[in-house]
Regions:
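Catalytic domains of carbohydrate-active enzymes, especially glycoside hydrolases
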Residues: 303-322
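Conserved small/polar residues in nucleotide/adenosyl-binding loops
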Residues: 326-333
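An acidic-aromatic substrate-binding cleft motif
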Residues: 216-231, 236-302, 314
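Short, solvent-exposed loop/turn and secondary-structure capping segments
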Residues: 119, 271-272, 323
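Active-site-proximal beta-strand/loop segments in catalytic clefts of secreted hydrolases
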Residues: 262, 321-324
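N-terminal accessory beta-strand-rich subdomains and adjacent acidic, glycine-rich linkers
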Residues: 1-248
Length: 333
């Protein structure tokens, strides 16, 4: 991938390993078709009233000949601000049900760029961001990491997507995915020696990374590129690659602003998760009616009323109280 004549991503591996089939090598090209698409559409809500969806597409049909007789399509869509690509498996006699073992997609960068990243995790994205060169990010991330107690750390050294990158020449690169439906979410393995990233799919408890049935397509892998970081934020590339809205009636969808009690327990506002200072409490065992409240749990009627009053006075549409009340005493709720 090039931007203004300069390389952004160097030649990189593609392919998927299924338990039933190796779809990473032994292919020959059956066909390659170019096309152009240009439309303007109106989202239900968003930053723009109208969105232009304009790209050049390359559809490459691949075949594993001889005894396998398998067909796979790799579809590329090139926009003014980046690239999206995905794998497609049409219906065919030699494949039906598949279990994903691994995805081999790589993103080979051109140097020791700066990353703006958080650790790859199977459960949460709630980490402080680290800014460091690829060669230094492992150590820098460990220094920056604050353990929360509910992490599910990836089994290899990974970072979360979307991943923001800045090159030494001042170019901004963003790696992410679009149209994530019936497939595992993607983290990125980090090779801090070769400055390489590769797909790391989130597994289930058995280590499986997807259960698929043909015909199918994977999510889009996306690479956005700009010499202005603001253009990455303003890009509609991922939105254009996502599936269209399937709802026939969208009249009830209205954008609104809201404030919430939940965030107070994360941002140091004084609220805590603990109803009581009794640290040995166990759900289903502890009788919370006999505990003395510490006064720091923000999800109580008096405090929520304060949020409601603040919202009303400041033109905020709603208050979100996203926390369980089941363990609070009656007079607290």
């Amino acid at each position: 991938l090039y931007y203004k004549g300069e390389p952004v991503v160097e030649p990189s591996a593609l392919g998927i390993l299924m338990e039933e089939a190796d779809l990473s090598n032994g292919f020959r090209i059956l066909d390659a078709t170019n096309s152009t698409f240009d439309e303007t559409w109106m989202p239900v809500w968003g930053e723009y009233e109208k969105v232009r969806n304009h790209y050049n597409e390359l559809t490459v049909t691949l075949s594993q000949p001889a005894k396998y007789d398998r067909t796979m399509i790799v579809r590329f869509r090139l926009f003014d601000d980046g690239l999206g690509f995905r794998y497609e498996l049409p219906e065919q006699k030699n494949m039906n049900y598949l279990t994903v073992k691994d995805e081999l997609t790589e993103f080979n960068l051109t140097g020791n760029h700066t990353l703006y990243c958080i650790p790859g995790d199977y459960d949460t994205n709630e980490f402080a961001y680290t800014t460091a060169a690829i060669s230094e990010v492992r150590e820098a991330m460990e220094r920056n990491l604050r353990k929360k107690g509910y992490e599910a750390k990836a089994t290899s050294f990974t970072v979360q997507t979307p991943l923001m990158i800045k090159t030494t020449e001042g170019l901004y690169i963003n790696i992410h995915e679009a149209a994530l439906v019936d497939y595992s979410a993607m983290l990125l393995n980090v090779d801090d020696k070769e400055f390489n990233f590769s797909a790391h799919l989130t597994p289930d408890k058995l280590g499986k990374k997807g259960y698929l049935q043909l015909p199918l397509h994977t999510p889009w892998r996306t690479i956005m590129v700009s010499d202005d970081a603001r253009s990455i934020l303003a890009s509609q590339l991922i939105l254009n690659l996502n599936e269209p809205c399937k709802l026939e009636d969208t009249s009830w969808i209205k954008p609104q602003k809201f404030i919430g009690v939940w965030w107070e327990m994360f941002t140091g506002g004084g609220g805590t998760w603990a109803y009581s200072d009794y640290y040995k409490a166990k759900p289903g065992i502890t009788d919370y009616s006999k505990l003395t409240p510490n006064g720091h749990h923000p999800a109580n009627t008096e405090h929520v009323k304060e949020y409601i009053d603040f919202a009303a006075e400041n033109g905020i549409d709603a208050v979100l109280v996203a926390v369980s009340y089941t363990h609070l005493r009656a007079h607290e709720t």
